[in-house]
Regions:
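Short loop/turn segments immediately following the C-termini of beta-strands
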Residues: 168, 212, 256, 300, ...
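Residue-level detector of Asp-centered blade-edge/turn motifs that repeat once per structural unit
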Residues: 157-159, 202-203, 246-247, 290-291, ...
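Hydrophobic beta-strand positions that form the internal "hydrophobic ladder"
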Residues: 163, 207, 248-252, 292-295, ...
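Multi-bladed beta-propeller domains
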Residues: 179-196, 222-240, 266-282, 310-326, ...
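Structural motif
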Residues: 109-111, 171-176, 216-220, 260-264, ...
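Amphipathic beta-strand/beta-sheet edge segments enriched in Tyr/Trp
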Residues: 25, 82-147
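Short beta-strand->alpha-helix linker/helix-N-cap micro-motif
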Residues: 28-88, 98, 102
Length: 425
């Protein structure tokens, strides 16, 4: 089954329902992670006069990661210059404490400051300050959460990154770029025809995607900052499933210009494609490994869609998935340890994950219409689209499936998520 056929199936299943579009979400966290660090994030002094509640955003980020549990801070009135009474916070059950302030500057910007404390050891773990315009208050909060996450887990936080996704209302399709929590969504492109397969470039400056605006699937790249588009692949037949190489110089794409759907590599600026494999089967949905040496892809060469692997320059093909008769939509974690994919189980499409070193396979959702998994750049969460309780939703999940966050709001056709890379600060 080709990428285009797969995508059209999901469009008919969900995008044909005609719900109103939604551009922002609220975060609803459910489930229990295996290990959660108790942290108190006190209300920031002065944040009542700001348009964003910094402490609430920080706490929501940390809880959504599955590694933190919020501790009640009711009655606390502290800021980053105050040394807290550690005994009080230990009694409340906190292992760490974040304090801060928000001050309006004379030029209209906001000065956001914070400090992190190790309550158990009584140690100052450092802090930062940000002078930001009003529109960047949420970004400042996400960066605070990144700092806290890295200090307490040793892994880089991904809260200040972005996601891309597609919505449909009536006959209007929109490509959106939003914060990793779904807020602050901005429309990047609108079309009366379907938009599918958004894929972030490695440096986060561009999105590749497929548009049907010319009544056939065509691959474009889109500059996120200025909105400029470049036509990449408009060959005879279908052009679909763009995937960036780690160096950003090449796109792997699926083309049917020579007959069946086959894998090609094409310069990221456009040009003549180079065929990667010779096969009479349908090969589609390529994705590069983080080192750029291999490509995972979907093929029906064994009779039904399964995930395979081959060298990125072409060569011998190796089958990867064996559990289940129908496996599609591969996504590789940035650390190279995990493969997420969608498996059809008794007619239901469920998110699965493979630990590549051991080959261990786990189903991590109990929903039945999952699609388009994409890893956070720190490899600790997966974003995907699904239906839950009859509603279309974007979800994030921990890799063990123990804690999920529904990025929910109004009903809407919200699809095709892709998680962007770390941003330069």
């Amino acid at each position: 089954m080709s990428k285009v056929i797969i995508k059209i199936y999901f469009f008919l299943l969900f995008f044909g329902l005609g719900f109103p579009a939604v551009a922002q979400f609220r975060v609803e966290v459910s489930g229990v992670g295996l290990t959660q660090l108790p942290i108190a994030v006190s209300a920031f002094r002065g944040e009542d006069g700001a348009p964003q509640k910094i402490a609430a955003i920080v706490q929501a980020d940390l809880e959504r990661s599955g590694q933190f549990r919020g501790v009640d801070t009711a009655g606390a009135a502290l800021d980053e210059v105050t040394r807290p009474d550690m005994a009080v916070w230990r009694q409340r059950g906190a292992d760490s404490l974040a304090l801060g302030s928000v001050t309006r500057l004379v030029d209209g910007r906001y000065d956001v400051r914070f400090r992190l404390w190790d309550v158990v050891r009584g140690q100052d773990l450092g802090g930062q300050s940000y002078a930001v315009i009003q529109a960047d208050l949420r970004l400042a909060a996400h960066r605070i959460a990144d700092f806290i996450y890295e200090k307490l887990t040793g892994d880089k936080g991904a809260f200040s990154t972005r996601i891309a996704y597609v919505t449909k209302v009536a006959q209007r399709y929109q490509l959106w770029v939003a914060d990793a929590d779904g807020e602050n969504a901005q429309s990047a492109f609108t079309s009366p025809e379907p938009i599918i397969s958004p894929a972030w470039s490695p440096n986060g400056s561009q999105l590749a995607y497929v548009s049907f605006e010319s009544r056939k699937p065509v691959v474009y790249t889109h500059d996120v900052a200025n909105g400029k588009r470049r036509l990449i692949a408009n060959f005879r037949g279908s052009n679909s499933a763009p995937a960036w190489s780690p160096d950003g110089r090449t796109l792997a794409v699926t083309l049917s210009r020579d007959g069946g759907s086959q894998l090609y590599a094409i310069d990221a600026g456009g040009g003549e494609p180079r065929r990667l494999a010779q096969s009479s089967s349908i090969d589609t949905e390529p994705v590069y490994t983080p080192d750029g040496k291999s490509i995972y892809f979907v093929s029906d060469r064994g009779g039904a869609p399964q995930i395979y692997k081959m060298p990125s320059m072409g060569g011998n093909v190796e089958r990867v998935t064996f559990a289940g008769s129908y496996n599609i939509s591969p996504a590789i974690s940035p650390d190279g340890r995990w493969l997420a994919y969608i498996s059809r189980v008794s007619g239901a499409f469920k998110l699965h994950i493979i630990e590549l070193a051991s080959g261990a396979v786990n189903a991590i959702t109990d929903t039945s219409a999952d699609e388009s998994p994409s890893f956070a750049p720190n490899s600790r969460l997966i974003v995907y689209a699904t239906q839950q309780q009859g509603r279309e939703a974007l979800m994030t999940t921990t890799l063990d499936g123990k804690l999920k966050a529904r990025l929910a709001g109004q009903n809407g056709n919200i699809r095709e998520p892709d998680w962007g890379p770390f941003q330069k600060q």
